[in-house]
Amino acid sequence: NIVDGVILPNLKMNTQAEGEPCVFLDAEGRCSIHEDRPGICRIFPLGRVYEDNSFSYILQIHECQKENRSKVKVSKWIDTPDLKKNQQFITDWHYFLKAVQARLAASGDEEQIKRTAMQILQYFYIEPYHTDCDFYEQFDKRLIQMKKLAGID
């Protein structure tokens, strides 16, 4: 998937038919991979709105088909480990991609665009992360290196 000149791998789950729910929902409509679900699933039915180098959560009211939902505070709903670090990671990644996209669009240099896109794939998706080390620290180091390579302050 290419978004504004940056290649981003996507996870796409095929459902049984158009409009069908997630294939990982069990007979009771509950997530069967709950402990290992992706980040976007962890916040569902919330979404994110990015503003002023941060983001906030919004409730997507038509996406969840469950009826008679109870009210739950956002802070209780999101059960991501190391929530503060995770939110900083999400913010840093989002605004890094925006900065790269702006820089590449301004350059118009097809070779630079391709080279930068491949470096992002290599640094963040292909090069393995060490499971015995903190993910966020590893990400931060890679982000600093990639910003230097891409000429982003």
Would you name each region that the model predicts?
Residues 1-153:
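Short loop/turn segments that flank or connect secondary-structure elements
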